[in-house]
Structure formats: structure tokens, C-alpha cells
């Protein structure tokens, strides 16, 4: 019984940390892959960055250039990355929706 209660408390703490991580990634799609799309070179999710690869490869988010939102919008950019080095849709717009 003790093991079960510790597992359920750990699972609830993971859920709360996941939601805080999802809210930390500005303009990204919510999910386990989009931990923080602002990690990497360039500015992802602000719509004003000029670096290439605005979203970090480690999180599997969308790799974008020109500051387009990697996961939720940007022009022709739908970021659904898979795996540690997965690239989502490659977008090159400057618009964030």
C-alpha cells in the first residue's frame, strides 16, 4: 500500500510539472515533446526572431526560422516532433497566431 501511494503522488507531481512546462513554452503545442521551444538559437514563439532553428532539436519541436511559432501557427508550420531529435514542420514565416 505504501508503494502505491508513493507512485500515485509521484504521478500527480509529474502532471503538475508537465503543465507548468507546457505553459513555459510560449506559442508551442502542448505535449511532452514541446518542453520549451524557446531553447535553442533564435527566438521561437515571439514572431520577431531572425535566427535559424528557433526551436531546439532536443525537445522534438518544430524547427523554424524567422521567428515563426513552432507548434501552434506560424505560416505553414505545424510542429509535431517525435523523439529526442525529431523535427516537426519546418516553417519560415514571421507570424504568430
Swiss-Prot record:
S-S bridge residues:
none
Q: Which domain of life is it from?
A: Eukaryota
- What's an example Gene Ontology biological process for this entry? sorocarp development
Entry-linked InterPro entries? HssA/B-related (IPR008455)
Q: A Pfam family this protein belongs to?
A: Coiled
Q: Give the compositionally biased regions (Gly residues).
A: 62-74
> What protein family does this chain belong to?
Belongs to the hssA/B family.
Q: What's this protein's name?
A: HssA/B-like protein 32
Q: What is the lineage of its organism?
A: Eukaryota, Amoebozoa, Evosea, Eumycetozoa, Dictyostelia
Gene that this sequence comes from = hssl32
